[in-house]
Amino acid sequence: MRSKSVVVLDYGSGNLWSVQRALQRVGAAVEVTADSAAGAAADGLLVPGVGAFEACMAGLRKIAGERTIAERIVAGRPVLGVCVGMQILFARGVEFGVETTGCRQWPGVVTRLDAPVVPHMGWNVVDSASGSALFKGLDAGVRFYFVHSYAAQRWEGSSKALLTWATHQVPFLAAVEEGPLVATQFHPEKSGDAGATLLSNWLGEL
């Protein structure tokens, strides 16, 4: 049986090579590229992201990545967003008083965590959604690795979406699963065995 093909979208942001290695370790055939045709053709598309929402959206638009994501979703083809790659899937992001339009796959806004200590950095427990395909086989109270100052702190989308929450003084969305579009605020590639299981689960859905 052939390995599932995954494109890690290279738009100038994200831990590209650590994501690539993590996917390869669970059996994926991985290509890191900015090429939209490759992104459209792969079994799965992973959208990484670190840094500022505005800069990530600018980089994504330079390579027509926003369109690639949208076309895959319309066609029912899997997309996984990680960290800021999750945040930019929402309609808006607000950083330092500046509002930036996101990919608008989900309604809502990404804002600075309303917590006394940011960034939120380190291991944290997640409360995974019942029936989640991403978290299949993982125990309750499983920990993942986070590095972020911003997050979606409420959900305004479909009631059919599966929502996984975490708390850093305040609750925020740690993962969302809605049809072919899934995303994690944490870094599965930095989350050891739990992250490997999650990535393997995603590959199994491709």
Swiss-Prot record:
Enzyme Commission number, as recorded: 4.3.2.10, 3.5.1.2
Active site: 83 (nucleophile), 187, 189
CC per GO annotation: cytoplasm
Regions crossing the membrane: none
Gene3D superfamilies membership: 3.40.50.880
A single BP term in Gene Ontology: L-histidine biosynthetic process
Functional summary from the UniProt entry: IGPS catalyzes the conversion of PRFAR and glutamine to IGP, AICAR and glutamate. The HisH subunit catalyzes the hydrolysis of glutamine to glutamate and ammonia as part of the synthesis of IGP and AICAR. The resulting ammonia molecule is channeled to the active site of HisF.
Name of this chain's protein: Imidazole glycerol phosphate synthase subunit HisH
